Amino acid sequence: MTSILQVALLALIFVSFALVVGVPVVFATPNGWTDNKGAVFSGLSLWLLLVFVVGILNSFVV
């Protein structure tokens, strides 16, 4: 169970880093928001899902 938590946490860290770098780039490019709105919302949905998964898995490990 601990290794599953570690993998989920690592995925959360990678998605967070990608969003921290990617979202400002999307807003800085011309027509970036209209062209990449779906990708940003998909990334945010994945991030929110991973936050809940890590929280639930953490309750089983601790």
From Swiss-Prot:
It is found in: Plastid, Chloroplast thylakoid membrane. GO terms for biological process: photosynthesis; photosystem II stabilization. Induction: Transcribed as a monocistronic and dicistronic transcript (with downstream psbM). The chain crosses the membrane at residues 8-28, 41-61. Disruption phenotype: Not essential, grows like wild-type at 25 and 17 degrees Celsius and from 20-200 umol photons/m(2)/s. Loss of PSII-light harvesting supercomplexes. Loss of PSII-light harvesting supercomplexes without a decrease of major antenna proteins, at 17 degrees Celsius and 100 umol photons/m(2)/s loss of minor antenna chlorophyll a-b binding proteins CP26 (Lhcb5), decreased levels of CP29 (Lhcb4), less extreme pheotype at 25 degrees Celsius and the same light. Altered phosphorylation state of PSII and LHCII, impaired non-photochemical energy quenching. SUPFAM superfamilies: PsbZ-like. Controls the interaction of photosystem II (PSII) cores with the light-harvesting antenna, aiding in the dissipation of excitation energy within PSII. PSII is a light-driven water plastoquinone oxidoreductase, using light energy to abstract electrons from H(2)O, generating a proton gradient subsequently used for ATP formation. This is Photosystem II reaction center protein Z.
